[in-house]
């Protein structure tokens, strides 16, 4: 045994895997839990006890682990399994060197590999670290600097971009022009129309621009280049859905389906279109569109717009003209059209593509949609041709008729060349004289012995050559032919779906005489010879007595076969002519009905046009009347407000006049009262001085009385008599002082004038509350503290 295979070899031990070059990344081998199974050669391995039993880890497993841990793809060395752990003193020499190996079967590892918890955490940590590094690299990438047009407002389109646009969308015959740096999108040159590259790449627009789209934007007096990409997606999506569902929509439908508004915070007159409330048809638009306004170009107006719209479509930008919503006409089929358009999925990002647009336009113009195997690189070159005219019902049927005739002619050519077998006519199949019965071979065995197959018949044209080329409708039956009877009856019976036909067939087969009656005469050569021999009278002896009776019978049979072929040809021609006459009669009847329907349609259209004109006239009259009523109401409102204002002004003038009169009277009264009060105060002052004067006068009177008393006493008067006289006077004038004081007080009271009390005037000078509120800036006086209307003072004119 070699040292490499010895169980004591350290490099081959179970614990040596920890000595790998990547001790941190590669887990130890005992942590790998594997499923081990015995191999088929376990018996052979048991016969060699001296051989070790290696356990080899599969290279694909090692490669998977190395790939996850970013290790080299070198496989691990072979591992040798031991029956027990090594001894402690194994570092020197092995104690198992001379020991015999146990009998262990060779096993192999399965494809199931399990990782320990630490190994799984390491793998997750490494994956997270790699993802983090990738994210950091993306963040470190510099953002592309936005390229702006120079000068601002000019176009960034180039000849190369327009050439790519032409090549991608099949606009080879359309005249496209790159704007100059001085030209702007809102004012294209004469004879040109402004469009954006984003309208084609992001909105799937085609040329010429759909008529209904132009009518919609023109009805608001704006240009197509003034609406956003999402707005155009709404319009084109509704048109495509109408083509697919065969729903006819008009401008009135679009104006009721959609609403248009000005883009907020926009420096130019740009507008966006959104669905009306509860009328969403197209959904799933991109959350944000790429900048498209800088990539505008000019297209020749005759290539972009239909001829009948050249004088009405606006090329320069305009301002939105909005009408009242309740004045918009609502079509009769508005709800049904909405349900038909919204019946199918209408997610723009998921369900709309250039292929769907092409298929919808093909359906519109009666062209079959291409299969999925056809290349989608053949773009919309046919749009220009198909947009010009739409096939009428007669043209569609005529086209179908031409296709059928071409197909029948091709089939006849293949039949004549022998590439295909002709088809049997149903009428010829039902005729017993054309196709022999299956029992015919049993009735004429001698013909078969002669080497002539009597059941073979070639194809017979349904009509002469001149009849076939005369009219396509007359050549509807392709070929009336007699199939070989042996082909029909060999090895199978004829299947008939009709039960009555089966019963008749059985009855015919029941009796041999009836079978012989339905056979053609040329199948019986004796009968054919007798028939032709009797045509010339008694000059010809009986055919059976002729020397060449057999050849004569054969010739007569062939002759009658030719006559039968001629009869079949005449019969088929006659039946074809009869069917053609019936078809012609039905066609004439259909033509008459179509003409009647056309007349009714024209009458209905004329009535509808008259009704429409009448409706428009009524609407115009109603609109005018409504405008007049509105104007009259506004004038009445203005007149009423003017009357109220004049009444208020008159009331204010009255109040001002009354206040001025009251103020003048008050001023006069104040002046008079002031003068009177001054005089009264002067009189009062003098009256106050009257007391002093009165006292002095009393003193003077007393002095005079004393003087008179002294003089009387000196003159010889008696004191007692004088005293009595004085007492009598005191009694007579006892109330004189009281009366004097009362008189003086009454006089003072009468002379005292009250202070003037001026009547307070309003701060506004008798002005109305409404005028004061108007001056204060109050526009709405509802809910104010005004008195009730019934309690307000009357402001009627005198």
Swiss-Prot record:
Task: Write out the biased-composition intervals (Low complexity).
Answer: 1-13, 462-473
- Post-translational modification Phosphoserine, affected residues: 762
Q: Where in the cell is it found?
A: Plastid, Chloroplast
Coiled-coil regions listed:
578-658
Polar residues bias (residue ranges) = 35-55
Listed GO CC annotations: chloroplast
- This protein's transit peptide sits at 1-58
Extent of Basic residues compositional bias: 137-146
Q: What is this protein called?
A: Uncharacterized protein At3g60930, chloroplastic
Chain intervals for the UniProt region annotation (Disordered): 1-99, 135-158, 417-473, 749-798
Keywords assigned by UniProt, alphabetized: Chloroplast, Coiled coil, Phosphoprotein, Plastid, Transit peptide
Its primary localisation, in coarse terms, equals plastid
């Amino acid at each position: 045994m070699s040292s490499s295979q010895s169980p004591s070899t350290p490099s081959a031990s179970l614990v040596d895997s920890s000595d790998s070059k990547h001790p941190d990344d590669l887990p130890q081998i005992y942590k790998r839990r594997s499923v081990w199974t015995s191999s088929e050669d376990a018996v052979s391995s048991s016969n060699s006890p001296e051989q070790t039993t290696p356990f080899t880890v599969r290279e694909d497993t090692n490669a998977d682990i190395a790939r996850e841990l970013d290790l080299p793809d070198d496989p691990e060395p072979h591992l040798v399994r031991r029956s027990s752990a090594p001894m402690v003193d194994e570092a020197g020499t092995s104690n198992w060197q001379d020991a015999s190996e146990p009998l262990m079967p060779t096993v192999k590892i399965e494809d199931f590999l399990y990782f320990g918890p630490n190994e799984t955490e390491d793998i997750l940590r490494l994956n997270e670290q790699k993802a983090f590094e990738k994210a950091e690299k993306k963040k470190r990438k510099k953002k592309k600097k936005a390229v702006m047009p120079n000068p601002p407002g000019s176009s960034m389109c180039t000849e190369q971009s327009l050439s790519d646009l032409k090549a991608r969308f099949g606009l080879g015959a359309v005249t496209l022009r790159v704007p100059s740096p001085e030209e702007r999108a809102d004012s294209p040159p004469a004879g040109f129309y402004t469009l954006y590259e984003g309208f084609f790449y992001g909105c799937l627009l085609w040329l010429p621009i759909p008529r209904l789209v132009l009518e919609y934007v023109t009805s608001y007096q704006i240009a197509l280049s003034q609406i956003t990409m999402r707005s155009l997606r709404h319009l084109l999506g509704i048109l495509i859905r109408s083509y697919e569902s065969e729903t006819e929509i008009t401008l009135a439908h679009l104006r009721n389906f959609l609403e248009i508004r000005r883009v907020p915070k926009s420096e130019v007159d740009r507008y966006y279109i959104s669905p009306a409330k509860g009328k969403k048809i197209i959904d799933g638009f991109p959350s944000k569109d790429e900048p498209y306004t800088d990539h505008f170009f000019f297209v020749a107006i005759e290539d972009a717009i239909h001829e009948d719209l050249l004088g009405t479509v606006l090329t320069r930008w305009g301002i939105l003209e909005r009408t009242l919503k309740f004045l918009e006409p609502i079509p009769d089929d508005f709800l049904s059209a909405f349900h038909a358009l919204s019946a199918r999925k209408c997610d723009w990002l998921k369900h709309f593509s250039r292929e769907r647009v092409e298929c919808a336009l093909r359906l519109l113009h009666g062209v079959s949609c291409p299969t999925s195997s056809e290349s989608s690189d053949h773009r919309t070159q046919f749009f220009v041709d198909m947009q010009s005219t739409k096939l009428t019902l007669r043209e569609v049927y005529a086209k179908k008729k031409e296709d059928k005739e071409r197909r029948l002619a091709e089939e006849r050519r293949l039949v004549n060349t022998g590439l295909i077998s002709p088809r049997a006519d149903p009428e010829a199949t039902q005729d017993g004289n054309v196709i022999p019965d299956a029992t015919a071979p049993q009735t004429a065995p001698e013909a078969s012995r002669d080497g002539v197959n009597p059941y073979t018949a070639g194809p017979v044209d349904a009509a002469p050559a001149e009849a076939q080329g005369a009219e396509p409708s007359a050549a509807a039956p392709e070929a009336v032919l007699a199939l070989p009877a042996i082909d029909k009856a060999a090895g199978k019976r004829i299947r008939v779906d009709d039960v009555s036909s089966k019963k008749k067939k059985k009855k015919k087969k029941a009796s041999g005489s009836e079978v012989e009656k339905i056979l053609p005469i040329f199948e019986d050569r004796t009968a054919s010879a007798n028939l032709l021999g009797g045509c010339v009278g008694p000059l010809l002896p009986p055919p059976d007595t002729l020397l060449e009776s057999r050849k004569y019978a054969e010739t007569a049979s062939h002759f009658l076969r030719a006559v039968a072929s001629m009869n079949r040809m005449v019969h088929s021609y006659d039946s074809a002519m009869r069917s053609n006459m019936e078809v012609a009669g039905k066609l004439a009847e259909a033509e008459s009905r179509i003409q009647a329907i056309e007349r009714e349609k024209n009458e209905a259209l004329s009535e509808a046009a008259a009704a429409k004109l009448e409706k428009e006239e009524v609407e115009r009259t109603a609109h005018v009347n409504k405008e007049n009523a509105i104007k009259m109401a506004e004038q009445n409102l203005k007149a009423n407000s003017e009357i109220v204002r004049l009444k208020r002004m008159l009331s204010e003038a009255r109040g001002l006049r009354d206040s001025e009169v009251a103020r003048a009277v008050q001023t006069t009264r104040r002046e008079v009262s002031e003068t009177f009060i001054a005089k009264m105060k002067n009189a009062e002052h003098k009256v106050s001085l009257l007391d002093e004067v009165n006292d002095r006068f009393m003193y003077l009177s007393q002095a005079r009385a004393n003087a008179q008393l002294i003089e009387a006493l000196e003159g010889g008067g008696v004191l007692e008599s004088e005293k009595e006289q004085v007492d009598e006077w005191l009694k007579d004038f006892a109330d004189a002082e009281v009366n004097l004081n009362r008189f003086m007080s009454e006089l003072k009271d009468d002379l005292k004038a009250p202070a003037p009390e001026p009547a307070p005037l309003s701060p506004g000078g008798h002005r109305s509350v409404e005028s004061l509120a108007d001056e204060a800036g109050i526009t709405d006086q509802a809910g104010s503290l005004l008195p009730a209307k019934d309690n307000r003072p009357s402001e009627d004119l005198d």
